[in-house]
Amino acid sequence: MTENPFHYLVEPLSGTSDKTFFNVSKLKATEYDSLPYCIRVVLEAVVRNCDGVLVKEQDAFNILNWKATCEFKEIPFLPARVMLQDFTGIPAMVDFAAMRDAISKFGRDPKQVNPACPTDLIADHSLQLDFTKCIVAQNVSSVPTVETHKPTTKQSPGKTLGRKAQCRSQSGCKGACELGAAHGSSREQIENTPMLCPFHLQPIAEPEAALKSLEIEFNRNKERLQFFKWCTKAFHNVAVIPPETGTVHQVNLEFLSRVVMEEKGFIYPDSVLGTDSHTTMVNGLGILGLGVGGIESEAAMLGVPITLTLPEVIGCELTGAINPLATSIDVVLSITKHLKQAGVAGTFVEFFGNGVSQLSVADRTTIANMCPEYGATVAFFPVDSVTLRHLKQTGVDVQSVSTFETYLQAVKLLRQENVQQPEYSKVLQINLNSIVPYVSGPKRPQDRISVMDMKKDFEACLNEKTGLKGFQIPEKKQSIMVPVTYENSEYSLSHGCVVIAAVTSCTNNCNPSVMLTAGLLAKKAVEAGLTVKPYIKTSLSPGSGTVTYYLSASGVLPYLSKLGFDIIGYGCARCVGNTNPLPESIVTAIKEGELVACGVFSGNKHFEGNRCSCVCANYLASPPLVVAYALAGTVNIDLQTEALGENAQGEKIFLRDIWPSREEVLEVEETMVIPSMFSELKLKIEKQNTRWNLLDAPESTLFPWDLRSTFIRSPPFFHKLEKIPPPIQPIEKAHVLLYLGDSVTTDHMSPAGSIPRTSPAAKYLIQKNLIPREFNSYGARRGNDAVMTRGTFANMKLFNKLVGKTGPKTFHLPSGQIMDVFDAAELYQKAEIPLIIIAGKKYGLGNSRDWAAKGPFLLGVRVVIAESYEKIHKDHLVGMGIAPLQFLSGENAETLGLSAKEQYSFSLPVDLTPRHKIEVKTNTGKTFHVIAAFDNEAEVTFYKHGGILSYVARKYL
């Protein structure tokens, strides 16, 4: 603390005797009060981590002056924690293990090397679907009994049967559908779905496909998983969430998020850097979450801040009351649509206004998770009373929540309506009252219709010419009524009659309120005396057993069943509309009357395959509207003014009479859904699973590298490590490895996905006695530098001007031969010839990818000369000790008359500074100047040390 210039801001937290914090609100009160909440979180991190070297005092004052300095001032940011998915976690932890080896060779204690902040690694990306054929059984007795290593599954809330017991349903269990066709992630279906009898909430034997895929997952990835387990034993600040537990964003939101962190009595706001694209979801909880690449996350783990350009912050004011018929999905999609149209790309969006309190945490996190849809970096909901209530419901003890509230009030991070609102770069307004429910159809999902306009639109479709929407029904036939007998009762069918109504939750699992709304609507409908006509084929496909648990625990499942919405199975409901044909009498009546019969579905937007041949119009609607239209029996209805039906007493029942209020839905969600969801996940993580628990892992401080391993290998990043960094050496007679054009992406540099059979990486694996089906993917082998280096620039779409055609080839200048990039680089390194890359504009576009910088370094590349860089990749090059040089404005290799077959010599001065001009000489006599594209002194320091890894390692020597 004594080295921190802001130490004077530290004070005890009111009401506690053992907790202190930086009261950043006292730094400059007036300026602080005008800051957006998300910027206040950044300021607190800078103040708390200020060391005068990587984080400077001036950085804090630049943030206080945010509105004037945003978009051009860069500030360092250290998160409270780091979250890794397994593909990015492997190389990061391999580097930490290698660093321990390196400092131990200098006689230092390797136990010193640990992540500087809490680091959570979630192993959710390793599963591949080797088997997709599920057991579809008429009863459980036909499913093989599982005797060994059953993974943990959620239990039914009701009475359970033994593993070998038979479900004695008269109708039989229809089982799960094809996993390969499931909507959403198939991996999530396997990892998160308890295997329950869909009719009776009884545990059943696991589907054969899931069991085999999980078994193969552990066998195929055993080395990686053993390494992860060693990490949990060897390193402080590292926790691993094993496979079969949940996806990164689910675990981050439901288990890892703290809102307020505490370390040795010191408290501060939670914030996270995550390598999963869904990291931004936690911004809905008031936790600043940023999605980053592997090198940025690794830097933060090493205690090195990432660089943020102070962003514009768009204030999104939510006003008005939510339309009673609008579901959470309507609200979420409408807000994201507004943001997309407003153009918020690259900004932080912060929500305020009296409408914010109407959004549940599930709504907020869904909006925050959809950042990629509208291009924002962050969609931030400051902590408020809704957030604090959510924490209590998810198992955080009352005393802790009280402490959080006291702290957040002290540093003015608790959003309240009666305080001064922050200043924003720009303010958008969204009136929640303007959000109305929509349905889509009748032929295309992109044709959206307000529910209020549904009757008018359907009648217009009857008149329109046959085409994208029209059916061209003659006016005299539009009022036709066709009598039909079904189950000894008489009915009449007309245009718009509903004959299929299917509720699915494939796309609604992340926000259960819409399914609860449907269930509560069904309950009220039954209590009001309404029924669904028996000829309408109704069905319910929950998407996962978790949704069934919600519906059962809240007591609404029997009411859905009473209306005919019986559960037909889990996963993808392909069978909806196709399992059994419509009753013959109904089909005959539709055909004879040439009726435009309708199906109403929720969930799947690709609904063409769900249609029966006699159903001309298909509409997509939210689950509660599916129930409503089923009750009405027609889509040709104005739900605002026309009754759904009559009860036994002849009283008309309108939708407004039975539609559950938002408050009712939220109460059920908060009392039933959220507590069960979080307690189940917590139990699952604490118990872990049998396979993980039985997995052997070393107990040593240093990792015992297996030289035969093709997954885990000690990287050579520290092989030349010295206590004192050597002075910058001149680069003499360097050859060009690659001469590239504009917009070269990180995928060109380090391709993801499968390993081609003819690639250098494949040849290496074959030499290790692997056959092609054992190659796995580049992602799975990120812990093996030999594979990843051979995969560098191995993209088939790479265009190298030295070769003149696409492919992972280059021209080896000394021999005059065209060969694989890796083979050429290997020859150059044997000859001790330094290498450079020449490129055009926007070098390093695309996803942040650590091996796009690590790979070139291991190929022997010491310099890249480009017209311009994608900033993140340029930072990665610096982080690996590769000098990013930039042609002067208006110049490039072509204008300078370079062929890239010359030899290049240049020297970076010992007193190198950011943007230093450097002279480059060629063996042909040509000279030109470039700019050293270092943006700050920290980058120069990292480069002089040979990269961030060496910089941090020397701190331990």
Swiss-Prot record:
Cofactor(s) this protein requires: [4Fe-4S] cluster
Keyword Disulfide bond belongs to the record: no
Residues binding [4Fe-4S] cluster: C506, C572, C575
Keywords assigned by UniProt, alphabetized: 4Fe-4S, Cytoplasm, Iron, Iron-sulfur, Metal-binding, Phosphoprotein, RNA-binding, Ubl conjugation
One of the record's GO cellular component terms: cytoplasm
PTMs per UniProt: Ubiquitinated and degraded by the proteasome in presence of high level of iron and oxygen.
GO biological process: intracellular iron ion homeostasis
Keyword Zinc set for record: no
GO molecular function: 4 iron, 4 sulfur cluster binding; iron-responsive element binding; metal ion binding
Localization: Cytoplasm
Superkingdom assignment: Eukaryota
Co-factor: note: Binds 1 [4Fe-4S] cluster per subunit. [4Fe-4S]-binding affects RNA-binding activity, thereby inhibiting activity of the protein.
PANTHER family from the UniProt entry: ACONITASE/IRON-RESPONSIVE ELEMENT FAMILY MEMBER
Described function: RNA-binding protein that binds to iron-responsive elements (IRES), which are stem-loop structures found in the 5'-UTR of ferritin, and delta aminolevulinic acid synthase mRNAs, and in the 3'-UTR of transferrin receptor mRNA. Binding to the IRE element in ferritin results in the repression of its mRNA translation. Binding of the protein to the transferrin receptor mRNA inhibits the degradation of this otherwise rapidly degraded mRNA.
Family as reported in the entry's similarity comment: Belongs to the aconitase/IPM isomerase family.
Name of the protein: Iron-responsive element-binding protein 2
Organism: Xenopus tropicalis (Western clawed frog)
Gene name in the database record: ireb2
